[in-house]
């Protein structure tokens, strides 16, 4: 079956791998997936990621981050926008995730950025997902 929402598929794979405490997870390569992983790495939710080819198709191997007791860094990761329901927000109405402890990932005219960066740059955009 074809994947129609690559971001949603990526978020589900990360959520499932994190819950069963896998060391890493393989994801389909796309520019938006790579941008989201850049933010997750910058914020400390994943350790690193590598891009590799398998039979001519590009994939990303994301290495998940855990604490000393093997508790995942990602407690919850949820898609906000879907292909059938896009959710947009101005920088003034940008929601806070877990009272500021989580992050919001936004696709804006400045690229894929966090909700805090969107507020600081005074740009709105499509709300992709929330992580905490």
From Swiss-Prot:
Q: Specify the domain of life of the species encoding this protein.
A: Bacteria
Please provide the record's keywords in A-Z order.
Answer: Ribonucleoprotein, Ribosomal protein, RNA-binding, rRNA-binding
Cellular component, GO annotation: ribonucleoprotein complex; ribosome
- Gene Ontology annotations of biological process type: translation
By what name is this protein known? Small ribosomal subunit protein uS8
Instruction: Give the disulfide map.
Output: none
Question: Which family would the database say this protein is a member of?
Answer: Belongs to the universal ribosomal protein uS8 family.
Q: Which SUPFAM superfamilies match?
A: Ribosomal protein S8
Molecular-function GO term, any one: structural constituent of ribosome
- Purpose: One of the primary rRNA binding proteins, it binds directly to 16S rRNA central domain where it helps coordinate assembly of the platform of the 30S subunit.
Quaternary assembly: Part of the 30S ribosomal subunit. Contacts proteins S5 and S12.
Show the InterPro entries listed in the entry: Ribosomal_uS8 (IPR000630), Ribosomal_uS8_CS (IPR047863), Ribosomal_uS8_sf (IPR035987)
